[in-house]
Amino acid sequence: MIAVLCGVFGLVIGSFLNVVIHRVPQKLSVVQPPSACPSCGNPIEPRDNIPVVSWLLLRGKCRHCSAPISVRYPLVELGTGLLFAAVAVRYDDDLVLPAYLVLTACLIAVSLIDLEHFIVPNRILQVACLLGVPLLVLAAADDGWSHLRSSAVGAVLGLGMLLAIHLVNPRGMGMGDVKLAGVLGLYLGFFGFGHVLLGLFLGFLLGSVLGLLLIGTGIRSRKDHIPFAPFLAAGAMLTLFVGTSFLDWYRG
């Protein structure tokens, strides 16, 4: 039941993330003004703001001017719902669940913004910290206060590792990625610094493999900038799902 509820909640959050993804790079408020069609300016009616369903009923077009509505909107909503449900299945009996739902939402927004605009907005990272810290404290009250120390160490570890890379190669590693690694360390470190190392390793592995494929196929050149935040996010999400099992297997 908790997975179903989180999945439905994720659909709603996904709808809000679409606003975040559109407005944050432009440094606009995510609260006001209400959402409107970018083509005709008519406000989006409540009946047209039902996640996924409204887009399907409208056949991907504005009710007023018939301008096309990007398929990204329902995909973000559906993807967020599915990920929320999956995280709930993995952590349904753990108080750390709310924190990891926050992390999931922030990673979706950061990844899509970085893919489109090549930036990792501080506003989203700040929200991840402001919501994550009290939620992790709440989880630690149930699981043990040592988890907070692990989270703090994880944040320093994630931040420090990528900061070192940035100092050596500033063009290859932006400060947005460095700060994102610190946030990931905060969350993943809750279960130990091994989870932080695994998450970063998977992020670098995925980034390297896809980067080589893009360059090898001629889609990108060595001079092109490839957003790294989506790979860090993917590595973190994989660690949320299989990190503990993998590390237990690795340690024998």
Label for each model-derived stretch:
Residues 1-12, 74-79, 84, 88, 97-101, 126-127, 133-140, ...:
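Hydrophobic alpha-helical transmembrane segments
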Residues 1-25, 100:
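Long, highly hydrophobic alpha-helical transmembrane signal-anchor segments
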Residues 66-142:
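Intramembrane alpha-helical segments
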Residues 11, 15, 19, 85, ...:
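Transmembrane alpha-helical segments of multi-pass membrane transport proteins and ion-pumping complexes
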Residues 6, 109-208, 248-252:
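Functional transmembrane core segments of multi-pass inner-membrane proteins
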Residues 17-72:
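Membrane-proximal soluble regions of multi-pass membrane proteins
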Residues 212-238:
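Interfacial loop-to-transmembrane junctions
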